Amino acid sequence: MPRLFTLGGLALRLDGAGGAHAPPQTKRLVLLAYLRLAAPDQLVRRDSLLALFWPELGDAAAHNALRQALHYLRRRVGCEAFVGQGAAAVGLAAGALWCDAAAVEEAVIQARWAEAAAAYGGGFLAGVHVADAAPELEEWVARTRERLRNAAVEASSRAADEASAAGDLVEAVRLAGQAEQLAPDRDDVARRFVAALSRAGRGGDAAQAYEAFAARLARDYGAAPAAETRALLASLRLTDDGRGAAELPPISAAAMPGSTALAGPGLDDRPPADAVPGTLAGADSQATRIARIARIARIARIARIARIA
């Protein structure tokens, strides 16, 4: 079965895992991705495709460009992969084309968290530019990219929970860190990463991860970590063997299937930076910040002593 790769770039592999790649034809491969992801197992009206992919061309030239694109794709994917309704609509037959983006979403739906986390290879159509396309196509790409990123964050977070429950604390840290890389500004993701580091006996790294998160929010959004995130750091206590007792926090509603926040920007509901003139929105007082920094330093020192011991 041909395989379409859309995460971290764009490529069509013709004969399965070991087959040759099709020559690069960006707009035509994005058209294939659109048929596979925007309307899976459904037909798309040809006039809609013309408006999305060739808005600058006249009617005759646009129809000709679509015919050539479909001819190119049929030669590589197979005529049997395409279904249609005369000259009015076209689509892909069910199961005719494997796509990495679809594989991620299907794994998430089926709660195969580790598989979904491993399958996410980067941003949807990262670095791909479709020349002379309609703004609506660019908006679809952006929405799909955000949806898949959120799916990968959820998958990595839940896979981290599974690894932690199984006692694989190293893998839990890796997966929680993967989620943190994808959503570096989300409080719930930061809490999970800090807690995973603490449970793995890396209290100093947990404190540093929190400090880096707080610095990002202050720098980029003029905001401070949520009270729950600050409370997690304050609650971290190290046992004699250096292992943190913090539990992995629950995933926020922003990462839950079916949540209206799933396709959101990935930030908690924080006030804008200019909500309080002359101050950082939601920031602590100077005394509170000094106390928090001192607490972080104490945790880091305890962790270093525990590791030496």
Predicted regions and their residues:
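N-terminal flanking helix/linker immediately upstream of nucleotide/cofactor-binding cores
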Residues: A281-A283, A309
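Intrinsically disordered, charged and Pro/Gly-enriched terminal/linker segments
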Residues: P2, G19-V30, Y34-Q42, S48, ...
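Long, intrinsically disordered low-complexity tandem-repeat segments
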Residues: I290-I308
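Short, Lys/Arg-enriched N-terminal segment that forms or immediately precedes the first helix
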Residues: L7-A20
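C-terminal flanking helix
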Residues: L70, R74-A81, A214
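Long, compositionally biased low-complexity repeat segments characteristic
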Residues: A254-M256, D284-A294
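Conserved catalytic core of two-component sensor histidine kinases
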Residues: R67
